[in-house]
Amino acid sequence: MEGNGSVDMFSEVLENQFLQAAKLVENHLDSEIQKLDQIGEDELELLKEKRLAALRKAQQQKQEWLSKGHGEYREIGSERDFFQEVKESEKVVCHFYRDTTFRCKILDRHLAILAKKHLETKFLKLNVEKAPFLCERLRIKVIPTLALLRDGKTQDYVVGFTDLGNTDDFTTETLEWRLGCSDVINYSGNLMEPPFQSQKKFGTNFTKLEKKTIRGKKYDSDSDDD
């Protein structure tokens, strides 16, 4: 009987806690409803106008990005094209690739997906054979390399797959996280944790290259397939 008494007392405590929680929720809802009731027609109309203005601004920004070639992963044909494209957009990701490097095709697939998702960033690809001067200027020596640019200046590089877990099977989300770490996309996840991967596997240091002239024009492949 003593056991039944303990159970009854425990049930009563739980019931009281539940009632208290329900009361808090009810009070919060009453408070929000009261706030809405106190908003006059003029204030409500002002809120609607602000919301509509924000929506119009967002739509205009989207159209501007699309007019500049955002929203798709595109190939450019020359160094001159590169400088023009970078000049037009605040955020740019450019894949320096070579046709014979297998890992470039892996990056192509992921970048095509991210280009559609992140309209705020322009996604490009450029064949290194068509851009010898630019590759020297940016120290592009390993293929594939992603140059990450903001306001016309190179912010960072993703060289090979080192920052992506040293695996060909990295996810699109992992590349998205890496680009977010360099602030070239609007990333909404947790930058402290690479998605779906072990933090230890990635480490914390990213490969960054300085803007210096290199001696040779030979490109090293990060892929086993040439």
Curated annotation (Swiss-Prot):
The keyword Transcription regulation does not apply. The modification Phosphoserine is found at residues 188, 221, 223. The keyword Cytoplasm applies. Residues 75-180 form the Thioredoxin domain. It comes from the Eukaryota. Keywords: Cytoplasm, Cytoskeleton, Nucleus, Phosphoprotein. CDD domains: Phd_like_TxnDC9. It is found in: Cytoplasm; Nucleus; Cytoplasm, Cytoskeleton, Microtubule organizing center, Centrosome; Midbody. InterPro entries: Thioredoxin-like_sf (IPR036249), Thioredoxin_domain (IPR013766). PANTHER family: THIOREDOXIN DOMAIN-CONTAINING PROTEIN 9. This is Thioredoxin domain-containing protein 9.
